[in-house]
From Swiss-Prot:
The gene is tatB. This is Sec-independent protein translocase protein TatB. Residues 90-131 are annotated as: Disordered. One of its GO terms (molecular function) is protein transmembrane transporter activity. The Tat system comprises two distinct complexes: a TatABC complex, containing multiple copies of TatA, TatB and TatC subunits, and a separate TatA complex, containing only TatA subunits. Substrates initially bind to the TatABC complex, which probably triggers association of the separate TatA complex to form the active translocon. It is a single-pass membrane protein. One of its GO terms (biological process) is protein transport by the Tat complex. The chain crosses the membrane at residues 2-22. Belongs to the TatB family. It comes from Mycobacterium bovis (strain ATCC BAA-935 / AF2122/97). One of its GO terms (cellular component) is TAT protein transport complex. The keyword rRNA-binding does not apply. Pfam families: TatA_B_E.
Length: 131
């Protein structure tokens, strides 16, 4: 929670504490906050070790599943669509349609023209009945 607080922010907090609490009560408040954080950390580590003892090897599996959920939670809608529905092909979103898709061998062989072949140099085919 406090992993990204820098020295500048700490200095601002001390200055605000000095103004609000005064120089007499500030050291006691800092000691109280440090001991409260230490107790909370000890309590949480005790709970973790108790769960590890009670659940056993399933605890690591549970942590793995929670890690996967955390990855999904951090995904943007675009990344989720790309990963799960489009099998990682993000050309729909990036507009990079020029790269050829890998060929899959047909059971009957090559019955028709290859869809990835380039159309000859000439006018672009146009269908007036198409919408």
């Amino acid at each position: 929670m406090f992993a990204n607080i820098g020295w500048g922010e700490m200095l601002v907090l001390v200055m605000v504490g000095l103004v609000v609490l005064g120089p007499e009560r500030l050291p006691g408040a800092i000691r109280w906050a440090a001991s409260a954080l230490r107790q909370a950390r000890d309590y949480l580590s005790g709970v973790t070790s108790q769960l590890r003892e009670d659940i056993g090897p399933e605890f690591d599996d549970l942590r793995g599943h929670l890690g996967e959920l955390q990855k999904l939670r951090g995904m943007t809608p675009r990344a989720a669509l790309t990963k799960h529905l489009l099998d990682g092909d993000d050309s729909l979103f990036t507009g990079d349609f020029d790269r050829p898709t890998p060929k899959k061998p047909d059971a009957a062989g090559s019955a028709g023209p290859d869809a990835t072949e380039q159309i000859g140099a000439g006018p672009i085919p146009f269908d007036s009945d198409a919408t």
